[in-house]
Amino acid sequence: MKYDLIVIGAGSGGVRAARIASVHGAKVAIVENNRFGGTCVNVGCVPKKLYYYLSQLNKDIENYKSYGWSIPKPSLNWKLFIKKKDQEISRLNKIYEGILSRNKIDIINGTAQFLNSQKIKVGKKTYQAKKFIISTGGKPRIPNISKNTKLINTSDDIFTLKKLPKRMVIEGGGYIAIEFAFIFANLGVKVDLVYRGKQILKSFDSEIVDFLIQSTPKGKIKYHLESQIEKVDKSKNDLIINLTNKKKISSDYILSAIGRVANTENLGLENTNVQLNENKSIKVNRHFQTNDSNIYAVGDVIDYVNLTPVAIRQGHFLADKLFNNKKTIEYDFANIPTAVFTSPQIGTVGLTLEMAKKNKIDAYELTTNFKSMKKTFSKTNKDTFYKLVIDKKDKTILGIHIISDDAAELIQILAVNVV
């Protein structure tokens, strides 16, 4: 079979690229070896947010008493929740498949391998195309093998958790690890967070991070900074986690969330001119073209900004550029709003003061913090902190960093003010 475009990977970026290319009249096929929707739908934002909403409901119950409500102790049917979560993901899988079918995009089930720059093999069949887009996404980074990885779960595994543990050790200091730490802590799990660095969320504003740590209710999350999991042993009833700082932790479940890596293995890229970066992500130019003129890449596989809206925008831009006769609008990924689903949430867009200084911009900060009226009846700490980074020269806003309830929604609106 010959196509104008073959997309490898039916995640958010790949599906958008395929759909837009088809709208422009291209003959398109898409290859997928798993479920439609990619990381976001199956093992990312969607199930993560469902976990988060579940945990927030439990957290809210604690605050109802402050308003005079008398509520019997609730019980969680974890198996029912997981069943409903899986049903929701299946619904979204079908929506993605429907988008492809309605746009007359051929679906090829299996794993693609390049034979050369114009041809791939899927199973026993070969397919040709004038252009290829690789959108195979990423996968969890696997911890060091000496840590007895059979006892360690990844951020993909967490979504098939059969029962809620009483104790959990999470290794990692990025947003994935921190989100899960707060999710499970708010579900009543005793969480120990292990991170090799001095500060969690190191790419975020340090004052925001400090505020988050101070907002953590006592006893819910214990932080073990400047340490790593060195070894894991199993006793009759416990997992024994040995840390590099010589401390030992007993737990029921271990989650490794030490980052994600690009999915570039077994694609047959050695049969093309595609080059990889040191971290195995695909090297592209600003128009997402690889070193092979026929092959492009978008989304997490290029390890630029690993967010679903970014992958969608990249796929849309690229399909317009390749198959639309009209001049495409240049993209700008300078100020991308980002959220972290903690308690309270973090929202950020633009530069921190440290970033501004590195860019040799003379800037200053405006900050405020307070407790919202909703929380004044409860015994929670201050739950809201806002920070603006201002250009001293022209008073424009360079960055906005907030921590509060609904910060993930607020930052979308506030982002339009950042230049």
Predicted regions located by residue number:
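Glycine-rich flavin
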Residues: 2-3, 19-26, 31-164, 197-201, ...
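Flexible, glycine-rich terminal cap/loop adjacent to redox cofactors
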Residues: 6-13, 17-34, 39, 46, ...
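Short hydrophobic core segments
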Residues: 6-8, 112, 127-137, 170-171, ...
